[in-house]
C-alpha cells in the first residue's frame, strides 16, 4: 500500500491536524474508560516531539448533527489530555475559520459532529478543515470505514495526508493476519445473529482452515446439523445458508465444527441454573447459552495448533459466569498459543479484559465496524483516500 506514514515526515514548525478516535464514555463530565485516549497518546506525543503545532479532532457520541450539545462536548477529553500531556492543551469551539496554535501546543477541536455536513462528507466543510493544516493525519481506525468530512474529505484537500502510527499498526496487523497468514488459520466468530455476520462468515470461510462459530450464530449451525435447539436464539431462515457455508468450507478441506455438548438453561438471567447436555439432548423448553467442556477442549486443541488466529465474538453468554466457561477456555487457549493472534469487536475486548489476556494477544484492534468490514474484504474509505494521496 502506497500510504505515507506520519513517522516518516519532517513536521518541524508544521501545523498538524490529527483525526483520532476519542469517542469515549463520559459520566458527569469525567471520562470513565480511557482505552482509546491512551491508544492515541503516542501519536500526539510523536507529533509534538517532531516540533509540530498540533490540532486534534474526533467525534464523541451521537449528537444531532449541526447542533451544539454540552452532553457531547470534547471538554472531558481536553481535561484528560491536559493531565496526560506535558504541554498546554485547550479546546477550540469555533475553529473552521482559523485557529491559533503554537509549536508545542495541542488544540482539541470541539466534536466534529457539531458541524453540518460531517456525516455526508460535505466538500465545503472538508476544504475548511484542510485549510487549517499543513499535514492531515488519519489515525482513527475505528472510523476508517466511514466516508465523512473529518475522516475522508479533509484528506482529499489537505496539502499532505498520511496515516498515524495507530492506524499504520492496525493495517499492518490485519494485513499480516489476512493477506499472508501463517497456517493453519483459525477464525472464531461469535455474536447473536448469522445475518449481521453473514458477509464476514462468507469471506472467512473462503480463507481459513477452521471457522469456529459461537453464540447465537452457533445455534443456527447446530440447527442446520439437524439438532433441536429448543427456545434458543437462532435464525431458521438462514439454516440453508449455514449448510451452504459448511459445504463450501468442506469442499476446500476446511471445517466449521459444531459443538458436541452445550450448556443450557430455562431462562436468560444472571441467576439461571446451568445444565450440561449433549447437543442431541436439548429439550424444547431450553436455551443454549454456552458450549460444553468437551467442545471447548476440542476448540482449544484447534487453537493450539494454529499459526494465525482471528477472534471476533464470544462463544457464550460470558457476562454470566455460569455460561462463560467456553469463552474463558478459548481465551486461555489463545493466550497460550504461539500463533499470531488478533482480536477485535466490543464483546471480544470485554472478554479479553475479563479473562486478563490483553498482553497475550498479538494485536487488539481498536475498531468495531471497521474491523468487521476489513474482515469482509471491503475497501475502507479512509484507507482508500490515504492510498490515493500516497500514490
UniProtKB/Swiss-Prot annotation:
Source taxon at top rank: Bacteria
GO cellular component: cytosol
GO molecular function terms attached to this record: ADP binding; ATP binding; phosphoglycerate kinase activity
Protein EC: 2.7.2.3
UniProt binding sites for ATP: 197, 319, 345-348
Pathways involved: Carbohydrate degradation; glycolysis; pyruvate from D-glyceraldehyde 3-phosphate: step 2/5
Keyword Lyase: no
Catalytic activity: (2R)-3-phosphoglycerate + ATP = (2R)-3-phospho-glyceroyl phosphate + ADP
Location(s), subcellular: Cytoplasm
Broad class of the protein's primary localization: cytoplasm
Residues binding substrate: 21-23, 36, 59-62, 113, 146
GO biological process, one term: glycolytic process
Gene3D superfamilies in alphabetical order: Phosphoglycerate kinase, N-terminal domain
UniProt KW keywords: ATP-binding, Cytoplasm, Glycolysis, Kinase, Nucleotide-binding, Transferase
The keyword Cell inner membrane appears for this protein: no
InterPro entries assigned: Phosphoglycerate_kinase (IPR001576), Phosphoglycerate_kinase_CS (IPR015911), Phosphoglycerate_kinase_N (IPR015824), Phosphoglycerate_kinase_sf (IPR036043)
Family statement drawn from the similarity comment of this UniProt entry: Belongs to the phosphoglycerate kinase family.
PANTHER family: PHOSPHOGLYCERATE KINASE (PTHR11406), PHOSPHOGLYCERATE KINASE 1, CHLOROPLASTIC-RELATED (PTHR11406:SF23)
Subunit structure: Monomer.
Protein name, entry field: Phosphoglycerate kinase
Taxonomy of the source species: Bacteria, Pseudomonadati, Pseudomonadota, Gammaproteobacteria, Alteromonadales
Amino acid at each position: 500500500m502506497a500510504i505515507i506514514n506520519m513517522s516518516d515526515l519532517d513536521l518541524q514548525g508544521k501545523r498538524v491536524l490529527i483525526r483520532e478516535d476519542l469517542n469515549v464514555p463520559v459520566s458527569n463530565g469525567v471520562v470513565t474508560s480511557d482505552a482509546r485516549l491512551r491508544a492515541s497518546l503516542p501519536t500526539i506525543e510523536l507529533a509534538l516531539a517532531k516540533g509540530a503545532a498540533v490540532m486534534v479532532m474526533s467525534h464523541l457520541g451521537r449528537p444531532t448533527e449541526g447542533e451544539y450539545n454540552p452532553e457531547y462536548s470534547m471538554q472531558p477529553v481536553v481535561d484528560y489530555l491536559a493531565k496526560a500531556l506535558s504541554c498546554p492543551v485547550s479546546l477550540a469551539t469555533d475553529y473552521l475559520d482559523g485557529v491559533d496554535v503554537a509549536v508545542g501546543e495541542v488544540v482539541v477541536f470541539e466534536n466534529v459532529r457539531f458541524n453540518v455536513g460531517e456525516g455526508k462528507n460535505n466538500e465545503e466543510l472538508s476544504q475548511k478543515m484542510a485549510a487549517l493544516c499543513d499535514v492531515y493525519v488519519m489515525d482513527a481506525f475505528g472510523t476508517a470505514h466511514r466516508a465523512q468530512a473529518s475522516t475522508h474529505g479533509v484528506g482529499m484537500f489537505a496539502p499532505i495526508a498520511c496515516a498515524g502510527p495507530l492506524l499504520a499498526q492496525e493495517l499492518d496487523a490485519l494485513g499480516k493476519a489476512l493477506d499472508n497468514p501463517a497456517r493453519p488459520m483459525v477464525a472464531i466468530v461469535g455474536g447473536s445473529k448469522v445475518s449481521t455476520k453473514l458477509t464476514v462468515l462468507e469471506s472467512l470461510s473462503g480463507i481459513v482452515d477452521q471457522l469456529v462459530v459461537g453464540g447465537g450464530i452457533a445455534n443456527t449451525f447446530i440447527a442446520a446439523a439437524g439438532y433441536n435447539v429448543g427456545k434458543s436464539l437462532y435464525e431458521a431462515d438462514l439454516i440453508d445458508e449455514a449448510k451452504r457455508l459448511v459445504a463450501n468450507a468442506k469442499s476446500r478441506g476446511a471445517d466449521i465444527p459444531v459443538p458436541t455438548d452445550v450448556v443450557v438453561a430455562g431462562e436468560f438471567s444472571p441467576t439461571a441454573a446451568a445444565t450440561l447436555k449433549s447437543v442431541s439432548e436439548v429439550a424444547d423448553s431450553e436455551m443454549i447459552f454456552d458450549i460444553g467442556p468437551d467442545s471447548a477442549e476440542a476448540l482449544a486443541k484447534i487453537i493450539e495448533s494454529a499459526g494465525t488466529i482471528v477472534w471476533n465474538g464470544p462463544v457464550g453468554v460470558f457476562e454470566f459466569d455460569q455460561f462463560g466457561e467456553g469463552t474463558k477456555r478459548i481465551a486461555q487457549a489463545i493466550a497460550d498459543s504461539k500463533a499470531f493472534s488478533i482480536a477485535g469487536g466490543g464483546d471480544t475486548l470485554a472478554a479479553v479484559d475479563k479473562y486478563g489476556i490483553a498482553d497475550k494477544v498479538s494485536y487488539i484492534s481498536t475498531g468495531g465496524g471497521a474491523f468487521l468490514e476489513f474482515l469482509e474484504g471491503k475497501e475502507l474509505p479512509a484507507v482508500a483516500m490515504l492510498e490515493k494521496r500516497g500514490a
